Design a protein with these regions (language model features):
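Ferredoxin-like alpha/beta domains used as RNA- or RNAP-binding modules
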Residues: 1-185, 191, 234-259
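A basic, amphipathic helix-loop patch mediating RNA/tRNA/ribosome contacts
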Residues: 175-224, 241
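Charge-rich, low-complexity terminal tails
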Residues: 223-226, 255-257
Length: 259
C-alpha cells in the first residue's frame, strides 16, 4: 500500500494519475500478475518509478520503441522479466503524396484525436523523411480501417516491426544552470536567455505548456522531468534538479530543442 506522504512530493493536478498508477501497483501486489499501463511521458514515468519504489517487491520496466520518449510501463514482481512483445506496441508507417502535402506532428496527432483516440493510447510520432507513429496494439485494426486521410490527403498505413522505428533527427542540446527558484518564469528566463518580463508575458499569453497543459501562472513550480513547450522558441526537458549553492540557488540540468 502506498504511503499517503507520497502525495506531498507531487502537484495536485497529478493526484489522479498517481491514484491510477497506485491502483495498478496494488493489483500486482495482491495478485502477483504483471500489469501494463498506457503510454506515459517522462514526467509520468518518473511518478511511476517513485510510486513503485514505495512498494517492497515491485519492479517497473518501460518501453515505447528504440529511444522513445513516450513509453508504456509493465509493473511486476521483481522476478518477472518482460519481453518487448509484452508491451503490446504497434508501429505504423504512413505513405502519403509528399509532393502535394506537408505533414507535421500536429497533423498526425490531430487526426488521431479526431478519430476518438485518446492521447494516452499513442506513443511517439516521428516526422522525418518518413512518418511513423506508435500506438497500443489493440487499436491496430481500428486505425487501419478508419485512418484514410490526413490534412485532406489520401494516405496508406503499413504495420512494421517496432525494431524498425526510425530515429528522430531532433538535435537536443544539453545545458545546465543555477536559478534563484523553480518558478516557471525564472526557469524560462534562463532557458530562452531573455528578460523575466518577456518570460512572464509568454506565460500570461498562454504560450507556455508544462507536460502538454497550458500554464498561465508565472509562479508555477517546476519539478524534475517536466516537459516545457514555449511557443515561438521550442521545447525543453528538465532532466535533473541538483542541490543548493551557498547563495541558496538551485542547480538544474535540462535539454532544449529550440528553433
Amino acid at each position: 500500500m502506498i504511503n499517503i506522504d507520497i502525495y506531498q512530493h507531487f502537484r495536485q493536478e497529478e493526484y489522479e494519475l498517481i491514484d491510477q498508477l497506485t491502483d495498478k501497483c496494488d493489483q500486482v501486489e495482491q495478485h502477483y500478475a504483471p500489469v501494463l499501463t498506457h503510454f506515459l511521458d517522462p514526467r509520468g514515468q518518473y511518478i511511476l518509478e517513485v510510486i513503485c519504489g514505495s512498494y517492497e517487491d515491485l519492479n517497473v520496466s518501460f518501453y515505447g520503441g528504440p529511444n522513445a520518449e513516450r513509453k508504456r510501463a509493465i509493473i511486476s514482481s521483481n522476478y518477472y522479466e518482460p519481453k518487448e512483445s509484452d508491451f503490446e506496441l504497434t508501429l505504423m508507417e504512413i505513405e502519403y503524396p509528399e509532393k502535394f502535402v506537408t505533414l507535421k506532428h500536429q497533423h498526425i496527432l490531430g487526426t488521431l484525436m479526431s478519430l476518438g483516440i485518446e492521447r494516452e493510447q499513442v506513443g511517439d510520432i516521428i516526422v522525418n523523411e518518413r512518418i511513423q507513429f506508435v500506438l497500443t496494439s489493440r487499436l491496430e485494426s481500428f486505425i487501419m480501417l478508419e485512418l484514410q486521410r490526413i490534412k485532406g490527403a489520401s494516405v496508406k498505413l503499413y504495420t512494421i516491426p517496432v525494431t524498425d522505428m526510425i530515429q528522430s533527427n531532433e538535435n537536443w542540446k544539453n545545458e545546465s544552470a543555477t536559478v534563484s527558484s523553480l518558478r516557471l518564469d525564472v526557469v524560462i528566463k534562463e532557458m530562452i536567455r531573455k528578460s523575466r518580463t518577456i518570460a512572464k508575458q509568454l506565460i500570461e499569453k498562454k504560450r507556455v505548456k508544462v507536460n502538454h497543459t497550458i500554464v498561465d501562472s508565472a509562479d508555477f513550480q517546476l519539478q524534475a522531468n517536466d516537459l516545457i513547450s514555449i511557443q515561438g522558441f521550442g521545447r525543453a526537458h528538465i532532466t535533473d534538479l541538483g542541490g543548493k549553492t551557498k547563495k541558496d540557488k538551485t542547480h538544474i540540468t535540462y535539454r532544449t530543442l529550440f528553433k
